């Protein structure tokens, strides 16, 4: 049984953020890490995860001070005109991120699944699907991800086990063979893919206040789960 109360559980939060972290990053990070750090990509992944942990700690500290979600806090302390400007900036930011993600997924679909199909048509269908999901709200999205999580990650585990025979062990021992600047570029690329952490600022309104601490722990666990998936992908 599901309840329609505009609330989601911390378990659903964990699964939501895992999909947000893993979805796009597994498509773009392998090539970026290979270009930036070569065999040292694993070090970049770990450093990017540490940067993400520090950023999450800062977000948790700010949310504790605000005692509410970001939008409600802006309504409380800012004049209406300034709040509207910030909301427009947030809209531009999220539109840009969503557009980039839609472009990446459409490109992968065209090249890997239906080669020769019109790219604009694929992109339009991806955007329509995303728009339909947004209209369903966060609670509907959480329900879908809760169902898909086990199925998709069991399949992922099976694929990784099959690929274990192609494991390149030297990737696991390449720490800091590349120069520090290259490793840092790779870690910044990883940190960029962890930017969905910022969404934590909007989640307090969907989780009971008594569970805010568990909310942060769920997001942190999701981030390191995704880091583990990325590290495994880098080693294969």
Model-found features: residue ranges?
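Short, Lys/Arg-rich, polar N-terminal cytosolic tail immediately upstream
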Residues: 1-8
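Membrane-water interface regions at transmembrane-helix termini and the short interhelical loops
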Residues: 35, 107-110, 128-148, 205-211
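Membrane helical hairpin/interfacial module
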Residues: 22, 26-119
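Hydrophobic alpha-helical segments and their helix-loop junctions in multi-pass secondary transporters
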Residues: 95-98, 102, 151-176, 234
């Amino acid at each position: 049984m599901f309840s329609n109360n505009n609330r989601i559980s911390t378990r659903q939060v964990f699964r939501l953020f895992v999909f947000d972290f893993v979805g796009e990053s597994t498509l773009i990070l392998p090539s970026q890490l290979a270009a930036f750090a070569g065999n040292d990509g694993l070090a970049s992944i770990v450093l990017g995860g540490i940067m993400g942990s520090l950023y999450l700690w800062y977000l948790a500290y700010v949310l504790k001070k605000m005692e509410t979600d970001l939008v409600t806090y802006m309504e409380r302390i800012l004049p209406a005109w300034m709040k509207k400007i910030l909301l427009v900036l947030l809209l531009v930011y999220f539109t840009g991120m969503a557009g980039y993600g839609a472009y990446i997924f459409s490109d992968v679909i065209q090249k890997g699944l239906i080669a020769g199909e019109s790219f604009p048509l694929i992109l339009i269908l991806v955007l329509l699907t995303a728009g339909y999901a947004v209209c369903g709200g966060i609670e509907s999205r959480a329900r879908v991800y809760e169902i898909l999580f086990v199925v998709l990650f069991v399949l992922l585990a099976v694929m990784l086990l099959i690929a274990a025979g192609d494991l390149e062990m030297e990737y696991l021992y390449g720490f800091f063979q590349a120069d520090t600047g290259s490793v840092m570029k790779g870690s910044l690329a990883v940190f960029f893919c962890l930017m969905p952490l910022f969404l934590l600022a909007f989640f307090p309104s969907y989780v009971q206040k008594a569970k805010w601490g568990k909310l942060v722990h769920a997001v942190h666990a999701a981030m390191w789960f995704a880091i583990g998936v990325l590290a495994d992908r880098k080693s294969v």
